Swiss-Prot record:
Compositionally biased residues, Low complexity: 764-775
Region annotation Interaction with ITPR1, ITPR2 and ITPR3: where it falls in the sequence: 615-977
Result of altering E138K: In a breast cancer sample; somatic mutation
Gene it is expressed from: TRPC4
Listed name of the protein: Short transient receptor potential channel 4
Organism: Homo sapiens
Entry's free-text remark on domains: The protein 4.1-binding domain (654-685) is required for binding to EPB41L2 and channel activation. The calmodulin- and inositol 1,4,5-trisphosphate receptor-binding (CIRB) domain (695-724) is sufficient for the interaction with SESTD1.
SS bond list: C549-C554
ANK repeats: 29-60, 71-93, 96-118, 141-165
Residues engaged in binding Zn(2+): H172, C176, C178, C181
Single Gene Ontology BP annotation: gamma-aminobutyric acid secretion
PANTHER family per UniProt: SHORT TRANSIENT RECEPTOR POTENTIAL CHANNEL 4, TRANSIENT RECEPTOR POTENTIAL CHANNEL
Extracellular side: 384-403, 454-475, 535-599
Length: 977
């Protein structure tokens, strides 16, 4: 048995270890490639350039190699935002691939611009898209540069791409059943849904809408509505589509925030998207605001600028209304409400009179309609009091005075609803819940009036009410009238929207009603399930004998579950604790049946009270909190809809005066009858070209004004968006990475500069060392004798002329003696070009003229150094080596005169003894060895003023036609041959 058990010993040390190996091995990088990618990562420009240049020659590395993270050198440079390296890599034609997409995702604008302007080589191999999708690319095939740029919402990148002429595929409708959509969904439903989501995410980009749409408001409205509808179909991506819809709504609101004047606001809100140049249109009907309400753009409608314009129109006749005391407001409204019949009669008689125009104002119209409805409710209250109680037993009672007074209001309400449905359309009428409530209320009143007429005609005798039939017309009419009264009173809640305190509460109540309807659906299902079970259990135990009262409304409840309807009532009232537990008992000794019945009844109460009722409370609390969080937006949107209903033309007169035909209505009716019903139809008089032209010019002017305002709004919005993005960006990990990359790049740049400076210094030192070595070697070779170097022969005067031809010319002029013949030498061999050394040039080729700072009188006494003819006397004196210090602003150098082909060492000696001849020349000495003999050569360096230098230049013309070049410095003048 021991062999079935694992025993650990020293012979099996690895039995408890899991061996690991790389399953998906990748190709390893060579050391050169690793160094190449590492240099790109660190931003070492010089090393990367060297690697690329060597790769072109020796092919040591693959410039398109990939690191373990799947990044090429170009992608690494893009990730580090190193534009210099990106430009360098592109210049060597590295493989681009998806680099543009990576640059867009990284939002490197400079890299995107470089990649867009980069022309791919004609011979570059293109990778098949299927391979890019599965192996090489991080992006799906439906992701294009413009779609990815729109996802990032980078305005600058989107602008660069749009300027290149890119396009976005147009998405099909939500419920499109075309062949393309059906086939794409059947082949790969996930890719089809993802592709649709990516396209809509790109189209919902605020930067793309602002840049490419002629009417950004209309585009945002339609796209938001379409995304909201799409979220109901694509339930899997509901949250994404709802977020995109909110993004479009917020963009429209932010764009409207940029308006700065009432003129701009009116141009935007009054613009029509379906403008026709030849149709006459009103320019002050708030068409764009109506469109926003239709698309439920609550953020746009509740925007402060929009609300300010609406408030100014609402209180047109009362500019200081909001600043008045509340008591003054109440008194004013009460007086206007009492006078609404007078205003209505004046409008009927003279619509253009001051009082007739006064009632057409939106605020006055609202007060008059409210006063009329309050009067109607007061009449309903009077009708419910039954002041006259003499005909209570009449089966068909005639209408009372109050009921006759109520009738015109009911007819006025019905006429108003018909007119509203005719003007706005059936679809818009149904979408408003208050209209549905009005429809139910008016239907109840019509049914009540009809039943009362039937009862008045059919039943005229007196009969005690207890003996009436259950479905008597009068009884049914009274029940319907009572229900209609409830609806009429609740209809007053709609007026709470105009108040800032009651408006949010009314909106919360409306949202809670939706939750109650959802709860009732689940509750009814539970109620029906338990009612069916209890009725099936207690159906056999129904009691009928000896009962004067049957049901749960009796003093002693019985037969609570005998029928399905009675069971439903019993379960409903049990929620409120109105059903006793003994209703589950039966007369027979069937304890098991009683136990099952009581258990079912108790389970129902637990589910309905503990679970469902608490769920309803939680739902209502959630709805109220949702409205409370957005109370301002919700209330302003509801108030705007109320205000817009009074801004409309028509519906001026309140009920019941709206049923009275006005002269204007009679004229319209006669005109309609004459046009449509008469045999001889009126022919429409054609309009003149002048009228059409003026109308077209007005509409075109409105369009141009709108486009101008939109251009300004877009500019302000983009500037604000960029400014807010920079403000909210803050310090992130990416910022520290970029800073680290910049420091690394700067480090390598500085190292490169220092390395180059050090190299140039070493090269110059080597050059000077080589020149000194060559001079020493020349001296050694010349000291051996003239037998080894017979190429060039110099005389004493040739040497003098070579060193200082200018001084020699001056000296020969003044001494009237010849200073030697012209120098005839062979052209020296070409040497490598070296850097100009000012001091060396002075020592080798130039004259050094001391520029005196003394006055003109002292300049004549300056010492002048020249070559003396007493060479023989100095030869006997022996070698004398002395140094001259050139005093030129602190410049001191040792003058080692080195002449090619001349084996000598000449040292300029400054005679401090101040030996001056009659010509003002100071004697200096130069020791020159010739054939192991030292010859003392007296040298002259003329020190002449800078002002006299130009005049003395002419003296050298007779001596040499090739004038020396003269360079003037601050304190001295240098003359070079």
């Amino acid at each position: 048995m021991a062999q079935f058990y694992y025993k650990r010993n020293v012979n099996a040390p690895y039995r408890d270890r899991i061996p690991l190996r790389i399953v998906r091995a990748e190709s390893e990088l060579s050391p050169s490639e690793k160094a190449y990618l590492n240099a790109v990562e660190k931003g070492d420009y010089a090393s990367v350039k060297k690697s690329l240049e060597e790769a072109e020659i020796y092919f040591k590395i693959n410039i398109n190699c990939i690191d373990p993270l799947g990044r090429t050198a170009l992608l690494i440079a893009i990730e580090n935002e190193n534009l210099e390296l990106i430009e360098l890599l592109l210049s060597f034609n590295v493989y681009v691939g998806d680099a543009l997409l990576h640059a867009i995702r990284k939002e490197v604008v400079g890299a995107v611009e470089l990649l867009l302007n980069h022309k791919k080589p004609s011979g570059e191999k293109q990778v098949p898209p299927i391979l890019l999708d599965k192996q090489f690319s991080e992006f799906t095939p439906d992701i294009t540069p413009i779609i990815l740029a729109a996802h990032t919402n980078n305005y600058e990148i989107i602008k660069l791409l749009v300027q290149k002429g890119v396009s976005v595929p147009r998405p099909h409708e939500v419920r499109c059943n075309c062949v393309e959509c059906v086939s794409s969904s059947d082949v790969d439903s996930l890719r089809h849904s993802r592709s649709r989501l990516n396209i809509y995410k790109a189209l919902a980009s605020p930067s793309l809408i602002a840049l490419s749409s002629e009417d950004p408001f209309l585009t945002a409205f339609q796209l938001s509505w379409e995304l909201q509808e799409l979220s109901k179909v694509e339930n899997e991506f509901k949250s994404e589509y709802e977020e995109l819809s909110r993004q479009c709504k917020q963009f429209a609101k932010d764009l409207l925030d940029q308006t700065r004047s009432s003129r701009e606001l009116e141009i935007i809100l009054n613009y029509r998207d379906d403008n026709s140049l030849i149709e006459e249109q009103s320019g002050n009907d708030l068409a764009r605001l109506k469109l926003a309400i239709k698309y439920r753009q609550k953020e746009f409608v509740a925007q402060p600028n929009c609300q300010q314009l609406l408030a100014s129109r609402w209180y047109d006749e009362f500019p200081g209304w909001r600043r008045r005391h509340w008591a003054v407001k109440m008194v004013t409204c009460f007086i206007i409400g009492l006078l609404f019949p007078v205003f209505s009669v004046c409008y009927l008689i003279a619509p253009k009179s001051p009082l007739g125009l006064f009632i057409r104002k939106p605020f006055i119209k609202f007060i008059c309609h409210t006063a009329s409805y309050l009067t109607f409710l007061f009449l309903l209250l009077l009708a419910s009091q039954h002041i006259d109680r003499s005909d209570l037993n009449r089966q068909g009672p005639p209408p009372t005075i109050v009921e006759w007074m109520i009738l015109p209001w009911v007819l006025g309400f019905i006429w108003g609803e018909i007119k509203q449905m005719w003007d706005g359309g059936l679809q818009d009428y149904i979408h408003d819940w208050w209209n549905l409530m009005d429809f139910v209320m008016n239907s109840l009143y019509l049914a009540t009036i009809s039943l009362k007429i039937v009862a008045f005609v059919k039943y005229s005798a007196l009969n005690p009410r207890e003996s009436w039939d259950m479905w008597h017309p009068t009884l049914v009419a009274e029940a319907l009238f009572a229900i209609a009264n409830i609806f009429s009173s609740l209809r007053l809640i709609s007026l709470f929207t105009a108040n800032s305190h009651l408006g949010p509460l009314q909106i919360s109540l409306g949202r809670m009603l939706l939750d109650i309807l959802k709860f009732l659906f689940i509750y009814c299902l539970v109620l029906l399930a338990f009612a069916n079970g209890l009725n099936q259990l207690y159906f056999y135990y129904e009691e009928t004998k000896g009962l004067t009262c049957k049901g749960i409304r009796c003093e002693k409840q019985n037969n609570a579950f005998s029928t399905l309807f009675e069971t439903l009532q019993s379960l409903f009232w049990s929620i409120f604790g109105l059903i006793n537990l003994y209703v589950t008992n039966v007369k027979a000794q069937h304890e098991f049946t009683e136990f099952v019945g009581a258990t079912m009844f108790g389970t129902y109460n637990v589910i309905s009270l503990v679970v469902l009722l608490n769920m309803l409370i939680a739902m209502m609390n959630n709805s109220y909190q949702l409205i409370a969080d957005h109370a301002d937006i919700e209330w302003k949107f509801a108030r705007t809809k109320l205000w817009m209903s009074y801004f409309e033309e028509g519906g001026t007169l309140p009920t019941p005066f709206n049923v009275i035909p006005s002269p204007k209505s009679l004229w319209y009716l006669i005109k309609w009858i004459w046009t449509h019903l008469c045999k001889k139809k009126m022919r429409r008089k054609p309009e003149s070209f002048g009228t059409i032209g003026r109308r077209a010019a007005d509409n075109l002017r409105r369009h141009h004004q709108y486009q101008e305002v939109m251009r300004n709004l877009v500019k302000r919005y983009v500037a604000a968006m960029i400014r807010d993005a920079k403000t909210e960006e803050g310090l992130t990990e990416e910022n520290f990475k970029e800073l680290k990359q910049d420091i690394s790049s700067f480090r390598f740049e500085v190292l490169g500069l220092l390395r180059g400076s050090k190299l140039s210094t070493i090269q110059s030192a080597n050059a000077s060392k080589e020149s000194s070595n060559s001079a020493d070697s020349d001296e050694k070779s010349d000291s051996e004798g003239n037998s080894k170097d017979k190429k060039k022969n110099f005389s004493l005067f040739d040497l003098t002329t070579l060193i200082h031809p200018r001084s020699a010319a001056i000296a020969s002029e003044r001494h009237n003696i010849s200073n030697g013949s012209a120098l005839v030498v062979q052209e020296p061999p070409r040497e490598k070009q070296r850097k100009v050394n000012f001091v060396t040039d002075i020592k080798n080729f130039g004259l050094f003229h001391r520029r005196s700072k003394q006055n003109a009188a002292e300049q004549n006494a300056n010492q002048i150094f020249s070559v003396s003819e007493e060479v023989a006397r100095q030869q006997a004196a022996g070698p004398l080596e002395r140094n001259i210090q050139l005093e030129s602003r602190g410049l001191a150098s040792r003058g080692d005169l080195s002449i090619p082909g001349l084996s000598e060492q000449c040292v300029l000696v400054d005679h401090r003894e101040r030996n001056t001849d009659t010509l003002g020349l100071q004697v200096g000495k130069r020791v020159c060895p010739f054939k192991s003999e030292k010859v003392v050569v007296e040298d002259t360096v003329p020190i002449i003023p800078k002002e006299k230098h130009a005049k003395e230049e002419d003296s050298s013309i007779d001596y040499d036609l090739n004038l020396p070049d003269t360079v003037t410095h601050e304190d001295y003048v240098t003359t070079r041959l």
